[in-house]
Amino acid sequence: MSKKNQSNRLANQHKQSQGVVGIFGDDAKSHDITVGKISKIVLENLESEYPQLSFRYRESIKKEEINETLKKIDPELGQTLFVSNSSIKPDGGIIEVQDDNGDWRVVLVAEAKHQGKDVENIKKGILVGTNNDQDLMAAGNAIERSHKNISEIANFMLSESHFPYVLFLEGSNFLKETISITRPDGRVVELEYNSGILNRLDRLTTANYGMPINTNLCVNKFIKHKSKTVMLQAASIYSQGRGERWDTKEMYEIMLEISRTSLKAMGSDLFTQITSNK
């Protein structure tokens, strides 16, 4: 590597580290720090770590583009589209890398969902329900849109051997253990993780075939059944588990790990660029 390129890389690394310090400063659980902002910090890190590669960030993908990708796999796929300008827009956007053939390939897709304010309400002494006489609010269905986005990205990446979709869950509807919360008047309210009223994790684990959560499932799983081989594209689902907010530095580290796994999975298609001295 030339001295000029080395200098540029060090400058980029410094810029990236400044960004990390800025976003993960005093309040790592700030409501203002979105998964989209974290994605852009991940992008900066990747650009610094792999200066030979070209990356880009997109906020959305058009349904038309997804259909065109499907048609390349099989002409019978991707035929139906009623709204020409429809698109999907994951919370954290899409990071892509340009491969040795000049094609853009997905490195990371991230989303974060908060559902269930029972912990916050109990701590504040707020009662809920029609008559404002209940401690717990029945879980809603706000996370259903995640299923659509996961399916659309799975279609878009049907020809790939990796699926870097990461979904961060927080709030009382995604508990992994029973917790006890004390109200201002001293009364203790127990939130049971296996309550059908509260927990909505099972509605999302269909997107990873019931495999473990809080696990990097970026590399596709190939299973054999009788004479058939089936490829599984599983979302990597991470739940905070105690009804609290995610630490953004933790999110960043998970997203970076999944991005690196994607690049490793595409290694042979990036080899020429990675081994160049530009």
Model-derived segments and their meaning:
Residues 1-32, 42-48, 178-278:
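C-terminal tail/extension regions appended to the core domain(s) of diverse proteins
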Residues 48-52, 98-102, 154-161:
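Secondary-structure boundary elements
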Residues 121-216:
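Acidic, metal/cofactor-coordinating or nucleic-acid-engaging core segments within structured domains
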Residues 59-104:
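Active-site metal-binding core of divalent-cation-utilizing nuclease and nuclease-like domains
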Residues 25-32, 36-68:
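N-terminal, Lys/Arg-enriched amphipathic/low-complexity engagement segments
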